[in-house]
Amino acid sequence: MKIISSLGSRLTNSLPIEKKQRALVEFVINTYQPQQRADLFRALTEHRKNQLLNLFPEHHNKSFSILFELMDYRELIRRYPNTFGEEIAHLEQAVSECYSHWLDFWCECEIAAIKTLFPIEADAPHRIELPLKDCAYRGFLIDQIEDSELWVTTPSHPQKMPIKDAITLSNLELFIKGEKWYEMLPLLSLSQKGKHFVLLKHPNNEASPTLVASMLVQDWSVNQTWLSYAQQFSNEQWQFCLPDHSYDVLMELQLFKPALSKCDSLPEFDHQFRRQLTGTQAVCEVLRLTVSGNAQQKLYFLYLAQKKLIQILNQMGYKIGFTIIEQPFILNFYQTIEPKSYFRSGYNDLNNNGKQSYRGFWMIERMDKVFSDTNFRDYRHAVSQRRKYDLTKRKEKEYA
């Protein structure tokens, strides 16, 4: 009852919504230990998710951002009261008055928890210069991010922190909060362990390097946890679009026994790929390409991060890199390159917002050649020209 009383005293009706939100976040961070907090968020998320799926079974393959917005959060709580005890019921009731849904609140708590651990000091730089010059940055793979002793800052939080926390903060701010990829919340631990590519700005006047881009790289040995093979990303609602000539290109790699045969759906292709792959050490999944900065800087870091990672993967002997991409700048560029370098395998409008997400894969040796022959000016020009071409085609359809 003391906790409930403490919560109530922080949320008087006269407070502005921003102060109520801040008070709620501070309450959760100060009341629950990290593992308690993680267990609470996961358990209540799973509970509400299952409730919503029972109410709207036709949305079982849709994203969390769609599912959790199908019904007004306050109405959901009113009709289906919380069964996790009085304390959690009061907490969720308070959250429903301040946030659009539980996942929105979870994300804000995780962001605040990291920033609270590493408060900005008085001598921290107010602004970090991010020049568009390749020589100002270095990119490399870290095998076990949880064991790394590297400390960095981020453009949004110029206070040094362990690289695993900086990657997590970037994923939270740019992917989960920015793009509403709430599916990443229960899997946030993947941002804090395993193999990651990082792109860092060399320290200039700053005390520490600055993280400007990162990617999660998962080997075949953990393919059972790949996002590409999760139910949401491998089902019949995905339009299969793998071109016929891709089978010959894949066969040339000599990674399959027997060779892959033509498929009619994405789940069928996934099943055959997993069953017949023998060269498992040459295949990986690349996810969570997170970039910082303004619009121009983000485009530049998209280019440079891909270029440097693909070069490293090629040097290490990787042949195929699975991807899930929604970012138009990346997709526009891929449509301009040598057609055997990248293959789309399927697409789906996961968020019902008119934006297609594409599953596909890099042919890494060919992609390395593409990026070796491409500077940022070429990349930007190719993206711009493709965008103009698509716009012209769209207008032609409208007037046809």
UniProtKB/Swiss-Prot annotation:
Pfam families: AHL_synthase (PF17327). InterPro entries: AHL_synthase. It catalyses: a fatty acyl-[ACP] + S-adenosyl-L-methionine = an N-acyl-L-homoserine lactone + S-methyl-5'-thioadenosine + holo-[ACP] + H(+). The keyword Zinc-finger does not apply. One of its GO terms (biological process) is quorum sensing. It comes from the Bacteria. Its EC number is 2.3.1.184. Keywords: Autoinducer synthesis, Quorum sensing, S-adenosyl-L-methionine, Transferase. One of its GO terms (molecular function) is N-acyl homoserine lactone synthase activity. Belongs to the LuxM / VanM family. Required for the synthesis of N-(3-hydroxyhexanoyl)homoserine lactone (3-hydroxy-C6-HSL) and N-hexanoylhomoserine lactone (C6-HSL). This is Acyl-homoserine-lactone synthase VanM. It comes from Vibrio anguillarum.
